[in-house]
Amino acid sequence: VAKFGRQQITYRDAPFHRYIGNVLWRQNHQTFDAFSIQNTSLPDTRLSYAFVNKINTIFGDDRDAGIIRNGVIDVEAHLLNAQYSGLPFGKLEGYGYLLEYEDAEATSSKTLGVRLSGAPAINDAWNLVYTAEYARQSDYKSGTMDAQDYYLAELGAKHKGWMAKLSYEVQE
């Protein structure tokens, strides 16, 4: 499936779009002026790519702050995401987000990461719930940011409509 023009781009269900998403819990959703393509021809696999040149933020047309001009961020971004759900115990995801900001080149960054998540059945009533994710964010093109590592670890249980889990999330 290919799309061109203003669109919402998400690679995970809400609220789990940590880096790329539509900020759907706000009254105004974030959209992208982009070309995107998604391929699901391989079994249990979704391959996605998007080239974005504008991010239409949640703030509306009259917002100017930092890199936001009239509610828009000018960017040249390449978004790559691959997901494989054919594992018996969960879903594996790899991603690379390359962002070059036109009005703040020093903040241009690349984020490369991997995520494994699942909810395998323990028995007929209970599921084990887990997520493990690692990403590294560093400078890209004329960016000058220091590299940062992101870690997420979650473990919990799900019973019927209820779920409880412990999470550890840090970016350093």
Regions found by a protein language model. Give the residues of each.
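Signature for the C-terminal beta-barrel architecture of outer-membrane proteins
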Residues: 2, 22-172
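Short Pro/Gly-enriched beta-strand edge/turn motifs at strand-loop
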Residues: 15-19
